[in-house]
Design a protein with these regions (language model features):
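Accessible peptide chain termini
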Residues: 1-3, 172-173
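Binding-interface segments
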Residues: 3-168
Length: 221
């Protein structure tokens, strides 16, 4: 699929097994095995590094005592100048996480950063992940957004940053397109998640040809 292998053992990508439920011609419920390809945030970083376009990259969880100000209109963000007085990160105070940050600098000298508040990320997940909305409604834990919100939040901010402002190699373009595609036993791919709950705004990750409503999935990992 890619010119250079993406190793799932290193946390770059994963195939998540699903049981897809459907009614057969006799009206009986049946299940078929499917697998969803998921790029992890480390995978996007690896592909960016391999492209040779990027001089530096970084990403981070942001704690309340590290943030001075954030302007959602201009995108400008200011952190404290002295992190030695910031204790929340070292204490592992997860309830003090206020946002997620990613930054890159190209070899041309161009640099760009992106910050999303925790609320921004949560709203994004609710809007574009049917599985996450299902978990919230049914109080279940079938979505990666539910079981590992931090990893998915970092992935979202990195993916948005690269897709909006980065230089995308062929592999990076393919990874953005293939992310969250679900495959059946015959290798046919479709997008069963990552759809907005309403069509009022364009999905920045939308794929053409995914007009069907996503079906309910049972994760079997």
């Amino acid at each position: 699929m890619y010119k250079r292998q993406i190793d799932s053992n290193l946390g770059f990508a994963a195939l998540v097994p699903y049981d897809k439920s459907f009614k057969d011609a006799n009206g009986q419920w049946q299940k078929i095995k499917m697998a969803q390809f998921q790029m992890m945030y480390k995978g996007f970083i690896q592909l960016a590094i391999r492209s040779g376009y990027y001089e530096k990259m970084n990403y981070a969880v942001v704690y309340e005592d590290e943030l001075v100000s954030y302007n959602p209109i201009t995108g400008e963000i200011e952190f404290v100048s002295d992190f030695s007085n910031c204790a929340q990160r070292n204490a592992g105070e997860q309830d003090k996480i206020v946002g997620y940050y990613a930054w890159f600098k190209l070899k041309t000298g161009f640099s760009q950063e992106l910050y999303m508040t925790t609320a921004d990320v949560d709203n994004h997940a609710r809007k574009y992940s049917q599985a996450y909305r299902y978990d919230i409604e049914k109080k279940k834990s079938s979505s990666k957004w539910t079981t590992d919100f931090e990893a998915m939040a970092l992935k979202t901010v990195i993916k948005l940053l690269l897709s909006k402002w980065g230089i995308l190699s062929v592999d990076m373009q393919r990874a953005i397109q293939d992310d969250q595609k679900v495959y059946d036993e015959e290798g046919n791919g479709a997008y069963l998640d990552n759809r907005p709950d309403q069509d009022t705004e364009e999905d920045p990750f939308a794929i053409e040809g995914s007009a069907e409503e996503p079906e309910e999935l049972d994760i079997t990992e």
